Design a protein with these regions (language model features):
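Gly/Ser/Thr-rich loops at beta-strand to alpha-helix junctions
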Residues: 63-71, 91-93, 176-187, 281-285, ...
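Histidine-anchored nucleotide/phosphate-binding helix
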Residues: 45, 68-80, 184-195
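A short, small-residue-rich loop immediately preceding and capping a beta-strand
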Residues: 54-75, 79-88, 172-180, 200
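Active-site-proximal loop->helix
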Residues: 46, 71-118, 213-226
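Phosphate-binding loop/pocket of nucleotide- and phosphate-handling active sites
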Residues: 290-311
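Positively charged, low-complexity intrinsically disordered leader regions
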Residues: 1-57
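Active-site/ligand-binding loops adjacent to catalytic centers
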Residues: 193, 199-283, 287-294
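Small/polar-residue-rich loop-to-helix segments that shape phosphate-bearing ligand pockets
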Residues: 91-170, 239, 244-265, 270
Length: 311
């Protein structure tokens, strides 16, 4: 049985500390505490799709040394028994956790002279074009709107959209961490297809990348997918100006990075019950909510855990 057969399994919604948590960190094919989360699901979706199309011999990718995507992609490649070529901008990759994990999963890791994610990705893309049967998995585990078909992008987001289906009926506020924003795009797509009956408010928490610097990216992707597939107007559901006067849902954007609260590199360790939040992502969100926005921590709030750190 391939990991592709697990893509529609619903991760649980649990109560901890008097509120709900959507545990997408429990999408963990190798067991809880290993690689996990929404982005892993999307990574597996792509590799599984390419494998089913036939003649897949390997996957090439590139990103900064701290990116969890290295371990995700390498593990998926090992599962499907294909090669994995990773480009990163460090000379000693085994000193970095996710690159070390990728190496243990069997990836071939090379260094780029320029360590920026864009440069690493470009080098990986060039390699994928040169080698028969290799596919390029884009930096941040995404599909560029300009370089991929509508059908491929819609399928990529639909695999995460399913997870909305078990949001409890009494949830009124949904809080979503936003980094590269592919997970939140999938979640909002799911809300449009399978509206949780009690949902009134959506809080987007910017923790870097698009979530802090270009939250309109989510609207652009939704419009590209939803308006073609469902014939619905994205703006009738979500107001990305955050005025919420004419949209179905009250939208709030809390931008943590770049506003003086924290930087991307900082880590904040937080826990509620037995949940240990990722210190670079969800941990910052929980700390911010406790310190600056406690009004959202209510019994009818659900916090979406996109993923947790590897133990």
């Amino acid at each position: 049985m391939t990991w592709g057969s697990k893509l529609r399994d619903l991760t649980p919604v649990e109560r901890h500390g008097g509120m709900y948590f959507k545990r997408d960190d429990k999408f963990a094919p190798l067991g809880y505490g290993n690689i996990n989360g929404s982005k892993l699901r999307q990574c597996i979706y792509l590799v599984d799709k390419w494998y089913d199309e036939g003649n897949l011999k390997g996957v090439a990718s590139g990103s900064v040394s701290q990116s969890p995507q290295h371990a995700f992609i390498a593990a998926a490649c090992r599962h499907y028994n294909v090669g994995c070529y990773i480009v990163s901008g460090v000379r000693k990759p085994l000193e970095h956790k996710y690159l070390r994990m990728a190496h243990e999963f069997g990836a071939h890791i090379v260094s780029s002279r320029v360590g920026y994610a864009q440069a690493c990705g470009a080098q990986a893309r060039k390699a994928s074009l040169a080698w028969e049967g290799f596919r390029y998995l884009e930096t941040n585990i995404t599909l560029d709107l300009e370089k991929n078909s509508f059908r491929d992008i819609e399928g990529f987001h639909r695999v995460g959209a399913w997870q909305v289906m078990n949001i409890p009926e009494d949830v009124e506020t949904l809080i979503i961490p936003c980094g590269s924003c592919n997970s939140v795009t999938s979640i909002l797509y799911g809300i449009m297809m399978y509206p949780p009956p009690g949902l009134k408010r959506i809080v987007l928490m910017g923790i870097g990348n698009m979530g802090s610097n270009d939250i309109g990216y989510v609207r652009r992707r939704l419009r590209a997918v939803v308006e073609v597939n469902l014939g619905l107007d994205t703006d009738e559901y979500f107001d990305f100006n955050f005025a919420s006067e004419n949209a179905k849902y009250d939208m709030v954007h809390l931008n943590l990075n770049g506003t003086g609260y924290c930087t991307y590199q900082q880590e904040m360790r937080e826990a509620i019950g037995d949940i240990r939040f990722h210190p670079r992502y969800e941990g910052k969100c929980i700390r911010y909510l406790k310190e600056r926005a406690p009004e959202y921590l209510t019994p009818t709030t659900c916090f979406w855990i996109v993923g947790s750190d590897v133990m």
